[in-house]
């Protein structure tokens, strides 16, 4: 059997579950009215588009999206952008909201979110179940992970990557492996992670992406559901309980293409979210959104093109080293090193620098904004200065991050909130 046909058979026998129910509390007010996977990224996408695109580009066409926290905008986006698959051809992207299928509780943890959908998974008759994190931005060919799982004879395979020890502390599951990448130890979000052999600065962290043999997964979830002391979590409970008696392997994260550096970003804090967007402005960014070999799919709104108007000596509509999305109007204003999402308007004599501006924002005249994240629908009053003096920003009710990024939301401006 050719390698292409072998991979094709593996992906056809796989059902993917994307866990997209988390809030992302370290993003503070940015996720007050949306789940983290519904957060905007890269000018026109949402975070959920990246694991979904990875599935489609990898050949996995049966996908369930598990939702819970403030899921309206997430569900709406997935239905609009990903609802075109044909069930009669064995393709589907389905929404799986918390629905108290087996108890009166909502999803209690990552393992419980899968357990409560066992009947739906079983109906699909997959040989393998892939459980994926829905709140990271990355490019990954899941077919390689599937092939490694099948060839090793593993019961479970955990996708992993090396991260700095300081970054992993309290944030990631950390594992120990032998020379064959079999997992010998696993600790969920330790305060003092064990470093990789021979590298005291790095440790092997779980990406939250797993492959299971289906019946093995069901057996472990049922056992876990009967354990009154369990947190119903893969990292805290399932993995530590099975590594001694079962074959659990680690799979090092690789680029989808040879000779390219693998790309993965957590974007779980205001600083990391801002930084990951800023990286896209490089002439040769680590994440190339223009790569036709691995397209990122999303819901395409029908919008007019961006427009730049006025070319006077005292006001000139211009943008430099920036991403400007559909429907934007830069009217006699200057935008430098910034990411502007759909239908942003920047009015005359204003300057926006080193900032991430989410959709439907209006920046009125004579504003100065730098090192900021402006949430969707904000109307920045005329003459407002943001990002130049952190004490002044805090006095206005804005949030300033550890690294000096200013977050502005509608609520902070006294505008109506509650719908995303």
Swiss-Prot record:
EC class name: transferase
InterPro entries found in the cross-reference section: ADP-Glc_PPase, ADP_Glu_pyroP_CS, GlgC_bac, GlmU/GlgC-like_hexapep, NTP_transferase_dom, Nucleotide-diphossugar_trans, Trimer_LpxA-like_sf
Any GO MF annotation of the entry: ATP binding
Binding site for alpha-D-glucose 1-phosphate: 107, 173, 188-189, 206
Keywords: ATP-binding, Carbohydrate metabolism, Glycogen biosynthesis, Glycogen metabolism, Nucleotide-binding, Nucleotidyltransferase, Transferase
Annotated EC: 2.7.7.27
Pfam families given in the database record: Hexapep_GlmU (PF24894), NTP_transferase (PF00483)
Single Gene Ontology BP annotation: glycogen biosynthetic process
Disulfide cross-links: none
TM regions (residue ranges): none
Catalytic function, reaction form: alpha-D-glucose 1-phosphate + ATP + H(+) = ADP-alpha-D-glucose + diphosphate
Biochemical pathway: Glycan biosynthesis; glycogen biosynthesis
Biological role: Involved in the biosynthesis of ADP-glucose, a building block required for the elongation reactions to produce glycogen. Catalyzes the reaction between ATP and alpha-D-glucose 1-phosphate (G1P) to produce pyrophosphate and ADP-Glc.
Complex and partners: Homotetramer.
Family recorded in the similarity comment: Belongs to the bacterial/plant glucose-1-phosphate adenylyltransferase family.
Stored HAMAP family: GlgC (MF_00624)
Protein name: Glucose-1-phosphate adenylyltransferase
